Regions:
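Short helix-terminus and kink motifs of transmembrane alpha helices
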Residues: 8, 50, 117-121
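C-terminal ends of transmembrane helices
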Residues: 16-17, 42, 61-72, 118-131
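Cytosolic regulatory and coupling regions of membrane transport/channel systems
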Residues: 1-26
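Generic detector of multi-pass transmembrane helix bundles and their immediately adjacent loops
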Residues: 95-160
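Short helix-adjacent coil turns
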Residues: 4-5, 46, 129-130
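Core alpha-helical transmembrane segments of integral membrane proteins
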Residues: 23-94, 99-100
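Catalytic cores of large soluble enzymes that bind and process phosphate-bearing ligands
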Residues: 2, 6, 52, 56, ...
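Loop-to-transmembrane-helix entry motif
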Residues: 17, 21, 75, 142-145
Length: 160
């Protein structure tokens, strides 16, 4: 090996890598969430007339999630709040005639918040025999899904 590292150098390099987390810019995350929302709504059988409103509500809902996460620093509260506002916006968009199917609009818009990767990793950990991390990840994923479900159920209970 041409250049070997000491343990101290290796540790400092690992710390530098850990500090230098490169995320996508916030605007790109919001645009991506909007596109995913619209795509999921269409895949579930939604009409193309609902696409613009789904794109707007999906992007807006994810922006609320990101900014409330910075403000509150509680992931579950941010997911609840953004799902709550997505539900309200979807219901009012249908009532005002901007959309036609509030259920598919809501499904598409909350999909970027759904913890699909966490659920997959939890199942993978459990199948690999890593029970502590599997149960931990699974519990976090279920809490996230529960917060999303509670928010939408609360909105439906409030409006109907």
């Amino acid at each position: 090996v041409a250049s070997e590292l000491t343990l101290e150098e290796l540790y400092s390099e690992l710390q530098a890598i850990d500090r230098d987390r490169s995320f996508f810019p916030v605007w790109l995350q919001i645009v991506s969430a909007a596109v995913i929302s619209g795509t999921i709504m269409v895949l579930f059988g939604g009409k193309m007339t609902d696409l613009p409103v789904t794109l707007i509500i999906g992007g807006w809902g994810y922006a609320v999630y990101l900014y409330s996460l910075k403000f509150f620093r509680i992931k579950f509260l941010s997911e609840f709040l953004s799902s709550l506002l997505i539900g309200i916006a979807a219901i009012y968009s249908v009532r005002f005639g901007l959309g036609s199917n509030q259920d598919l609009i809501i499904i598409g818009c909350v999909m970027p918040l759904v913890p699909g990767v966490q659920i997959t990793n939890a199942i993978r950990d459990l199948l690999a025999g890593h029970y502590v991390s599997g149960v931990s990840r699974g519990t976090e994923a279920m809490m996230t899904a529960t917060m999303i479900g509670f928010a939408i159920a609360f909105i439906f209970q409030l409006f109907y």
